[in-house]
Every structure is written in structure tokens, then in C-alpha cells.
Design a protein with these regions (language model features):
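Membrane-interface anchor segments at the N-terminal boundary of transmembrane helices
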Residues: 166-181, 217-220, 351-415
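Membrane-lumen/periplasm interface segments of specific transmembrane helices
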Residues: 287-373
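Hydrophobic/aromatic-rich transmembrane helices and adjacent perimembrane loops
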Residues: 53-56, 106-109, 225-231, 259-262, ...
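Membrane-embedded, hydrophobic transmembrane alpha-helices
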Residues: 1-72
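Membrane-interface alpha helices of multi-pass inner-membrane proteins
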Residues: 37-44, 205, 248-264, 270-277, ...
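Signature aromatic-anchored transmembrane alpha helix within multi-pass, membrane-resident enzymes
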Residues: 74-82, 247-257, 268-277, 287-297, ...
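Membrane-embedded, lumen/periplasm-facing catalytic core of multi-pass transferases
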Residues: 470-528
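Transmembrane-helix motifs of polytopic, lipid-linked glycan transferases
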Residues: 33-37, 61-64, 162, 172-196
């Protein structure tokens, strides 16, 4: 009997390949993230002491008691070690992005220092009660970013604040993307092994999923689109998981809560992905109710808080605030979504506001590699070679399903239906041309290539291998761009400035940071708290209008802040 696109039902040999070890570690990672954010929410909203530490230990002890120490002790320890490693690594360099410094990092620090969004729904009201220099009125009064700190979904901030409470630095919150990438890779191995028939093939597929350009480009930042992608991919894998057990459901439920807590569009994605999950996994009503209650508490701010306050549930994204305004030329903002998606997919990789023009798939023009490493690349944001991989994927899936018998078995129908659904979801967002908003497209391409890899059709298999090789080279180009961006923004213009300040600092000096308001908090916090400089003053200047004058110029920190040193 010939193989179908998805392969036949798993035989005992394949079942043995599907080790539970990767699945358990992935589950432990998701559970640990949920326990940390739930614990920090209990601490923040209800004032309970140290629940972000007590909950993981209590859950671990209960799990080991019921399931046995041999099955879960090592996965739990590995999960803790991976979270610690990701947090330590993330804290070694600065997040130099606008969004990270505008609201992600200030909100994380504020939650760590006692801000409760329920008792002080407007962040600035709480900031006015603080004496620290980074809450100064010169930074926050009239700062339009107050509304994002006050009202944006805060799961990543709760995670970062829990890490800070545990002793990690303020940059450790960016570890969430890395932790979810670990979970995605491990769970991918477990799910894809029976689908592809061989463990090494599953490792290849899991690696392609876990090294998506969006994840790579945002790993060194506090952006949450990469983490959203990982949560979406985990939920998709749960729908494909042949094991109908509790572990797969935990990963799916946890991923749905995480994506809804990362951003408002994540809540929309979660609702749309919950449909196939509920249809395929068929959890009990008791299970649904339990997870719904957990989600309602963890996500109570901002969603329930907004309902109680009479605000639109997704404020400030909804209402009079036009988030996408001026983010691209009108033809991209107002055009047909399928057309704008195609125009971006086959464009030069670029972060310009105007469309950079179309190119032949496979061509790599000047500046595209550098643009691919930027966290929020607008056009062709999945990398310079993704358009070529997309074209090859379309041919591979056509070759794999051209004969009726090769698409008629249940696993293949499930995969094709899910791929079609993901392509449809790509058009749900108002800006499908912006890669960071459409995680479904990349997942659909990878799954289509993996499915074609098991086709009995030689052309389909050959095209699949070619497509995966193109994706691998594309990942290499994106990583090169990420390295350049991170080195320039977080090393040359951050660590180097820190070294100069440390070398020349005297106790009777004053450090002056000149910057727009959106980065004022981060600059003052970094130099006063992290570098422990007693005298730090903030001076507002429009971007690009800074000048040290007669004071010593110590450099341009994260390419946004002029640092001056004044001597008496």
C-alpha cells in the first residue's frame, strides 16, 4: 500500500518513536509560564505574597505525587532551567526598540514595583505617587504612551515582573518568546514524528517552525508578535496531535490564554483557533469551565477591567485611536487584503513606509538582509527568500494532492483543511501585508512542505525538500540581519556607552539624558537603577535635536538617547 501525503495510521514502530519526553518538557514550560503569570496576578491584584514562587512548587509537588517523580521531575527541572537560561540571556543586552521602551519595559517595572491596574486603572495616577526619577512628571505628563501602559494586555509584563521579583533584571521579560520557542520545538518533535515517520524528519520540521523569522527578529526585544506566533503554532500542533490526552489539551488551553494575554489581536486569534481545537479535541464541559475561569482571572486586566470601566474592550486599539494610521502608504492601508498581502509577499524586504516595489521570487537586493533583522519589518517581513519558498510550496502541495486517492485519507484531509483555514485566517487582520500580524501564513507554508515530504509523488517530495532548503537559507539570512541589528542597537550604542560612562564617572558629576518622552523612562531607569548612578537628570528634546553643549558627550545610547556628563 502506498503512503499518503500524511502517511498511514501510526504503526507500533512509529508509536515508539513518539517519546513522551519532549512533550512533557513542552507541557512543563507552558504550565510554568501560566503559574508564574497567575502567581504574579494574585500578588498584584489581591496582594498575596510570593505566589509566583509558591504556585510552581506546589504544582510540581502535586504532579510528582500523582504521576511519579520519574515521569515529571526531570521535565519540571528542565523547564525551570530553560526559563532561567532565557531570562539570564535576555538580560545581557538592551531592548533598543521603540515599543519596548515606550510601554513594555515601563509597565513591567511598574508591576514589579507595586502598580495595581485595578486600583489605579490609569498608570499616570499611580506614577504621580512615586518618588523615583523615572516616574518624573517631565517624562509622563503629556506622554501619549500612558494609555498603552494602562490598557494594553499585560501577560508578558506579568511574566517579566515575576522574573524581576525572583531576582532577574528588567530586561529578562523578553525571555517569554524564547521560552515559547523552546516549547514549540519540543512539542513539534512529538507531534510531527508520527506524521513524518522518522524522528530526524520531525526535528527538521520542528526546527523550521521554531525558527520563524518573526520569532528570530523579536527574540532580543520585548515585542510580543514572536511570542504570539509561537502560541498560535502550539495550538495548531495541538489540533494535529494524534494523542488525545490531557497533555495536548493543556498545551492548547495554555497557548490560547497566552496569546489572548499578549495583545488584543491575540484574543481574536485565540477565539478563531479555539473552534478547530474544540471540534477536534472535544474537551469536557468541566475542563472548558476550569480553563475559562483561569483565563478570566489572568486576563481580567485589561479585558474585564475595561468592561467594568465602560471602555471598549480593546481600548486603545478600538475607538478613535487609529493604530495603523501613517504606518504605510494609503494603498496598503485601504486596499483589498488579498492584494496587499500579495504585494507585500513579493516585495523587496523593507521597513520603509512606502512600498519598496516588487521583485522576482528568490532575488535578494541591497539592504534586504539588514531589513529582515528589524523586529517589525513592514514589507516581505518573513525574509528575502520567503516568496520563493511560498511559490515552491504551492507547487509541492499541488503535486502531492493532484490525485484523488492521495488526498482522501482522514489525516491528509485534516492537514489540508487546517492549512486552508490558516490561509483564510491570514486575511482576518486589517494589515495582512505586515508579517508580524499574520503568523498563520508561515505556519501554513511549513505544514504544507512537511505534508508534501511524505507524499508518494516524487515531484512533491523533491519540491518539498527544495522548499525546506530555501526556508533554511532564508532563516540564515534573517539571523544575519538580526545579529547586525542587535549588535548595532544593543552593543555598539548601548554597552559601549555604558562602558564610557563607567570609565569617566565621578561621584560629584551629574548624568544628563536627553531624549523624547517615549524613551525617557528607560534611559533614567537604566542609568539610575541598573548602573546605580545617584544623580541622573532627564531633559526632554525632540528626536534628533539633542546636544550636550559644554557638557561631556558620552554617546548615543540605544541610538535614541544622548548621554551627557556634567562636572561641577
Amino acid at each position: 500500500m502506498k503512503e499518503t501525503m500524511m502517511g498511514s495510521e501510526p504503526n507500533p514502530a512509529v508509536a515508539r518513536l513518539q517519546s513522551d519526553a519532549p512533550r512533557r518538557v513542552a507541557t512543563a514550560l507552558i504550565v510554568l509560564v501560566l503559574l508564574m503569570v497567575t502567581g504574579k496576578a494574585l500578588n498584584t491584584y489581591l496582594g498575596l505574597a510570593y505566589p509566583w514562587i509558591v504556585l510552581p512548587f506546589a504544582a510540581g509537588a502535586l504532579l510528582i505525587q500523582r504521576a511519579g517523580i520519574r515521569k515529571w521531575a526531570l521535565p519540571a527541572l528542565l523547564a525551570v532551567a530553560l526559563v532561567g537560561f532565557a531570562a539570564w540571556t535576555g538580560n545581557q543586552f538592551q531592548d533598543a526598540t521603540w515599543d519596548g521602551n515606550m510601554y513594555h519595559k515601563p509597565a513591567t517595572v511598574a508591576l514589579h514595583e507595586g502598580w495595581n491596574p485595578w486600583s489605579a486603572p490609569e498608570f499616570i495616577d499611580w506614577a504621580r505617587t512615586r518618588d523615583e526619577p523615572y516616574y518624573a512628571r517631565s517624562i509622563w505628563e503629556g506622554n501619549d504612551n500612558n494609555k498603552w501602559v494602562s490598557h494594553y494586555p499585560n501577560l508578558s509584563w506579568l511574566f517579566g515582573a515575576a522574573l524581576m521579583d525572583t531576582g532577574f533584571g528588567w530586561e529578562s521579560g523578553k525571555a517569554l518568546s524564547t521560552v515559547l520557542a523552546f516549547a514549540l520545538f519540543l512539542y513539534g518533535i512529538s507531534v510531527l514524528t508520527p506524521m513524518l515517520g522518522k524522528r530526524w524528519r520531525a526535528v527538521v520540521g520542528a526546527m523550521l517552525l521554531a525558527t520563524a523569522p518573526t520569532l528570530l527578529a523579536q527574540a532580543a526585544t520585548n515585542y510580543v508578535d514572536g511570542a504570539t506566533y509561537a502560541a498560535v503554532a502550539l495550538c495548531v500542533l495541538a489540533c494535529l496531535d494524534p494523542q488525545r490526552g490531557r497533555i495536548g489539551n493543556i498545551i492548547a488551553w495554555g497557548s490560547l490564554i497566552v496569546m489572548a494575554g499578549l495583545k488584543f489581536t491575540g484574543a481574536l486569534y485565540g477565539a478563531l483557533l479555539a473552534l478547530p481545537f474544540l471540534l477536534l479535541r472535544r474537551p469536557s464541559w468541566k475542563e472548558i469551565l476550569g480553563w475559562a475561569m483561569l483565563g478570566a482571572f489572568v486576563l481580567s486586566h485589561p479585558y474585564l477591567n475595561h468592561l467594568v470601566s465602560g471602555l471598549p474592550i480593546a481600548y486603545p486599539v478600538t475607538g478613535n485611536n487609529k493604530v495603523m494610521e501613517n504606518q504605510a502608504e494609503p494603498s496598503m492601508l485601504e486596499g483589498n487584503r488579498a492584494v496587499t498581502l500579495a504585494r507585500s509577499l513579493f516585495a523587496h524586504t523593507s521597513n520603509t513606509f512606502t512600498h519598496p516595489g516588487l521583485k522576482l521570487p528568490g532575488a535578494v537586493g541591497p539592504g534586504e538582509v539588514d531589513a529582515a533583522g528589524i523586529p517589525d519589518t513592514r514589507y516581505a517581513g518573513f525574509g528575502p527568500l520567503f516568496s520563493l519558498a511560498f511559490c515552491i510550496t504551492a507547487l509541492a502541495i499541488l503535486a502531492a494532492t493532484i490525485k484523488r486517492r492521495e488526498r482522501s485519507d482522514q489525516p491528509t484531509r485534516l492537514l489540508l483543511t487546517l492549512i486552508g483555514y490558516l490561509m483564510l485566517l491570514t486575511l482576518v487582520h486589517a494589515a495582512p501585508w505586515w508579517a508580524r500580524y499574520v503568523p498563520f501564513l508561515y505556519i501554513a507554508v511549513v505544514l504544507a512542505l512537511l505534508g508534501s515530504w511524505r507524499s508518494p509523488s516524487l515531484p512533491a517530495r523533491s519540491l518539498s525538500i527544495a522548499g525546506m532548503l530555501v526556508l533554511a537559507v532564508n532563516v540564515g539570512l534573517v539571523m544575519q540581519g538580526v545579529h547586525r541589528y542587535t549588535h548595532q542597537a544593543a552593543v555598539e550604542s548601548a554597552a559601549d556607552v555604558d562602558a564610557v560612562v563607567k570609565q569617566h564617572w565621578r561621584s560629584d558629576n551629574t548624568l544628563i539624558v536627553q531624549a523624547p518622552q517615549f524613551v525617557g523612562f528607560s534611559a533614567v531607569y537604566h542609568f539610575s537603577k541598573v548602573m546605580e548612578i545617584d544623580s541622573v537628570q532627564y531633559q526632554y528634546v525632540p528626536l534628533g535635536s539633542d546636544s550636550c553643549g559644554i557638557d561631556a558627550d558620552r554617546g548615543y545610547w540605544i541610538r535614541l538617547v544622548r548621554v551627557c556628563q556634567r562636572t561641577p
